[in-house]
A protein has these predicted regions:
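Substrate/cofactor-recognition hotspot
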Residues: 5-87
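A short alpha-helical cap/connector motif
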Residues: 11, 27, 83-289, 293-366
């Protein structure tokens, strides 16, 4: 619900309460069903949720004993739950020019996105398809040998039919690990990508590679891990912003920093921390992955207009890379796969079912 709609609904609820008081001054002349509906509507409008049956019964009992509508309304409006919700309401409504939430009408008017733009026309960012072709030459044998199960199987932690980390991303991740043979991987935002990493390390018998997962909500990760994984995995169960940034200085050449976090830049966000604290601390030769980065550094219309995503990480990363000779784009999934579909089909056709949205960057200089 937008802020404007929320305010309108709140005003309507207040007016409804006033009408009830004016027309039912001698309480109670309404039915129990009326009182029940009144309580449900208050919860939906003021607290933005459905009330539990015990909550409905509590407030209906007060109303049936002669309690006023205003009393119930005011008690809900001054509750700790409402105050907790109210403190995070935006200072400016959706659609206001100060709001970071995407206004679809404004986006359609000004975005003018050319998804087929040539890489050399993206100003300030060096994107070399010929260099990606060379990287593909080193990756392709590993990609070709991919054997991901489509559905959950006991032999693997990862399976391709999931809504989080598609097969195209998994195939390139596996190939990057097999090519670079990292001794250490730090992952920010864990789950199916972690499963792919562990399957790959098992396959390559890379028992000495250590993984650190930074994940404040690790339920999905725990469901995918095996008991034996604890020997080489460290789980930091907190937001990356709460982690000592010196941990990123421990990564060495060909080690991997894998980022798949909230995709949102804002005051105190994980994406800000990653761009401003983690990346500058990396040593030369470290390989960096960002997920959900689509070419040409724009989000698909489906994400913006239908799913209503107001992500902005992609623009922060683009700005970070502009005129930045300390980092280089090594591989850009959506760009390369989109331009070389015939090559991908000959190498490992399942990628074309869902190419994914990964970008791989390398730190060139300290």
């Amino acid at each position: 619900m937008s802020v404007n709609s929320w305010i309108k609904a709140l005003v309507d609820a207040i007016r409804a309460a006033v009408v009830r008081r004016q027309t039912n001054a001698d309480r109670p002349t309404t039915t129990e069903a009326d009182d029940r509906a009144y309580v449900q509507n208050l919860y939906r409008v003021v607290l933005q949720r459905e009330p539990a049956e015990t909550e409905i019964a509590h407030w209906v009992a007060i109303l049936r004993r002669g309690g006023s509508d205003r009393e119930v309304f005011n008690r809900i409006l001054t509750s700790g739950e409402y105050k907790a919700r109210n403190k995070i309401l935006p200072g400016h409504p959706i659609g206001h020019y100060y709001s970071p939430i995407v206004d679809p009408d404004e986006a359609r008017k000004y975005a003018r996105i050319d998804y087929g733009i040539s890489p050399e026309k993206i100003l300030g960012v060096r994107i070399s398809l010929s260099e990606m072709q060379e990287v593909w030459g080193r990756l392709s044998a590993f990609v070709k040998s991919s054997d991901f199960p489509m559905n959950k199987e006991s032999r693997c932690r990862y399976y391709a039919i999931n809504e989080i980390f598609p097969i195209g991303d998994a195939a390139i991740l596996r190939a990057m690990i097999l090519l670079n043979k990292p001794h250490r991987i730090i992952e920010i935002g864990s789950g199916f990508s972690s499963a792919c990493m562990l399957d790959t390390l098992d396959e390559a018998q890379m028992a000495d590679t250590r993984l650190t997962f930074i994940e404040p909500d690790p339920q999905r990760l725990r469901e995918l891990l095996r008991r034996s994984d604890a020997k080489r995995c460290t789980l930091i169960e907190k937001p990356v912003q709460a982690v000592d940034p010196r941990i990123f200085e421990e990564l060495q050449q060909n080690d991997i920093l894998f980022i798949d976090s909230t995709h949102v830049m804002k005051t105190g966000s994980d994406v800000n921390f990653e761009l401003f604290q983690a990346l500058p601390r990396l040593r030369q030769g470290v390989l960096i992955h960002f997920h959900d980065i689509q070419y040409p550094f724009e989000y698909p219309n489906e994400w913006v207009y239908n799913r209503k995503y107001s992500w902005n990480e992609i623009y922060g990363l683009r700005a970070f890379l502009m005129y930045n000779s300390d980092f280089a784009i090594e591989f850009f999934n959506s760009l390369f796969i989109g331009r070389h579909r015939d090559l991908i089909e000959k190498t490992y056709a399942p990628i074309l079912k869902n190419p994914g949205a990964s970008i791989w960057i390398r730190k060139l200089r300290q």
